[in-house]
Amino acid sequence: MLSDDDLKWLETPQPGWSPVRLPHMILEDSFVSGDSSGRRLSLRYFRHDPDRSLRARVIFGPGTQGPPGHAHGGSMAAVLDEAMGGAAWMQGHPVVAAELTARFKNMLPLGARCVVEAWVSAVDGRKVRVAGRLRQGDGDTAFAEGEAVFITLDPKKFGALTSEASRIFSELDEGRS
């Protein structure tokens, strides 16, 4: 269970960050961001306004444990995957992952407050290359870094997610989200 301080930290954006709901969050059981119990992953997404990249605040709960007292590398890779995909969606690319590389830098203690940063690094036709970093929330300690190649799909394949994405990001651009 998260403390009141943890919940406040998750919800409070840094200067230049705007809260955002990613399109997949309309799904109740999203693997990464669909845990309402706080036992697995607790995270909130933000747009970094100066460069329109994605930021997230995340706390890895006891349900992410791998090595005793530390987050499983797969949970760290899953957070990077979702954040990097979200960064592509925020730039107008409805994508799915084709390739993901994660490099683990340090063990991540359970309950640590972390920040995820993700940004589109290149677009080549249907391929969208994205990079990301998972770091300590109040410092520079890197826990993981990653790169991914996402493939843009026909928006019709995403059904309601596409219209939700258009609504969310137009509201964000108008300052309402």
Where are these regions (language model features)?
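Residue-level recognition of well-ordered beta-strand positions that form the cores
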Residues: R57-I59, T101-R103, E117-W119, R133, ...
